[in-house]
Amino acid sequence: MRDPVETYMNLVPMVVEQTNRGERAYDIFSRLLKERIIFVTGPVEDGMSTLIVAQLLFLEAENPKKEISMYINSPGGVVTSGLAIYDTMQFIRPPVSTLCTGQAASMGSLLLAAGHKDMRFSLPNARIMVHQPSGGFQGQATDIMLHAQEILNLKKRLNEIYVHHTGQTYKAIEDALERDKFLTAEMAREFGIVDKVIEKRPEDPAPAPKAA
């Protein structure tokens, strides 16, 4: 059976551009990276996290002041992998705008909320879901207790991050994350995860008329 990842990569469109040295082909994601657009798609795990962090650091090195756009469509995943992306977003100098397309669940919603203030957006039919971290462990009782305490520590830290970015009280965040909480784009705006729900890309302002 063919590897589904290999199949997917073979389906990624190529973009051909004319340069002074002739034609140059890019896969579509590399071409968009040139425009400072990063995609966070699929489950959040170590491999994907490393690629996102590397792209953020590269774009910072290329221009430490120019905005980076992050498009998010993710069901969430590994907490530590998501926190690696989150910390890098806060660490680098360029402002990072976030936009939810499809869904931003679990760690995906945290990354959506982590965008630069007034630069966090959602498309109208996107869905956002927040909840507390989960984990399953087996082994000796002492080890299970240690892992359970670590989950509680992570839960507290994630709550604090949501408080910081949403403006909600700690109690409100704790109550919201107690179970899976599904939000429409407008509800996510009211909750403070995004700043604006957008249907169309804003048009460029018309140039000022020239003086006679």
From Swiss-Prot:
Main subcellular location: cytoplasm
Transferase keyword on record: no
Entry EC no(s): 3.4.21.92
Superkingdom of origin organism: Bacteria
GO cellular component, one term: endopeptidase Clp complex
Pfam families, per database record: CLP_protease (PF00574)
Protein's cellular compartments: Cytoplasm
InterPro entries to which the protein is assigned, alphabetical: ClpP, ClpP/crotonase-like_dom_sf, ClpP/TepA, ClpP_His_AS
Catalytic activity: Hydrolysis of proteins to small peptides in the presence of ATP and magnesium. alpha-casein is the usual test substrate. In the absence of ATP, only oligopeptides shorter than five residues are hydrolyzed (such as succinyl-Leu-Tyr-|-NHMec, and Leu-Tyr-Leu-|-Tyr-Trp, in which cleavage of the -Tyr-|-Leu- and -Tyr-|-Trp bonds also occurs)
Active site: S106, H131
Molecular functions per Gene Ontology: ATP-dependent peptidase activity; ATPase binding; serine-type endopeptidase activity
PANTHER family on file: ATP-DEPENDENT CLP PROTEASE PROTEOLYTIC SUBUNIT (PTHR10381:SF70)
Functional summary from the UniProt entry: Cleaves peptides in various proteins in a process that requires ATP hydrolysis. Has a chymotrypsin-like activity. Plays a major role in the degradation of misfolded proteins.
SUBUNIT field: Fourteen ClpP subunits assemble into 2 heptameric rings which stack back to back to give a disk-like structure with a central cavity, resembling the structure of eukaryotic proteasomes.
Protein name as catalogued: ATP-dependent Clp protease proteolytic subunit
Native source organism of the sequence: Rhodopseudomonas palustris (strain TIE-1)
